[in-house]
């Protein structure tokens, strides 16, 4: 994947302002609420019976932070995303059996969360760069499935 200097700047510039704990928790909670079938991968998280329960669930919050922290590795390694996510791809494929479509869904949700948090800065150019990034990350995570 080729990244222009502008794309790299738009991604890293915004990432430096992201509150990983808050945005990660919100992104995972939204995934579980908007796409309820994804909840089956989180049965050990306890109460996921309503949007309020999901948003207030400390395990959702903690895992959301973990997911977005991991996503930050893509930002740091834009030129080597495939290798950066090789082990996570293996884990999600072989052990967790996560449908790779869920990676794309979470990427789309992350775009919505970033747009909500950074409305003015999240210009169409910024969105295009981030959309490209979430697609590349989703593809890297799905790599083991192919």
Curated annotation (Swiss-Prot):
UniProt-listed Gene3D superfamilies: Globins
GO CC terms in record: blood microparticle; haptoglobin-hemoglobin complex; hemoglobin complex
Annotated GO biological process: hydrogen peroxide catabolic process
Family, similarity comment: Belongs to the globin family.
Source organism of this protein record: Stercorarius maccormicki
Keyword Iron: yes
Gene: HBB
Protein's recorded name: Hemoglobin subunit beta
Protein origin, superkingdom: Eukaryota
């Amino acid at each position: 994947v080729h990244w222009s200097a502008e794309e790299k700047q738009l991604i890293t510039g915004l990432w430096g302002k992201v509150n990983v704990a808050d945005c990660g928790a919100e992104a995972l909670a939204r995934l579980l609420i908007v796409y309820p079938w994804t909840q089956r991968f989180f049965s050990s998280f306890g109460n996921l019976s309503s949007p309020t329960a999901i948003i207030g669930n400390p395990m959702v919050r903690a895992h959301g932070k973990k997911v977005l922290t991991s996503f930050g590795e893509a930002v740091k390694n834009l030129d080597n995303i495939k290798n950066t996510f090789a082990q996570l791809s293996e884990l999600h494929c072989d052990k967790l059996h996560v449908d790779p479509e869920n990676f794309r869904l979470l990427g789309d949700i992350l775009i919505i969360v970033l747009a909500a948090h950074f409305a003015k800065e999240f210009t169409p150019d910024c969105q295009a760069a981030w959309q490209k990034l979430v697609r590349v990350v989703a593809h890297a995570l799905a790599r083991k499935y192919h």
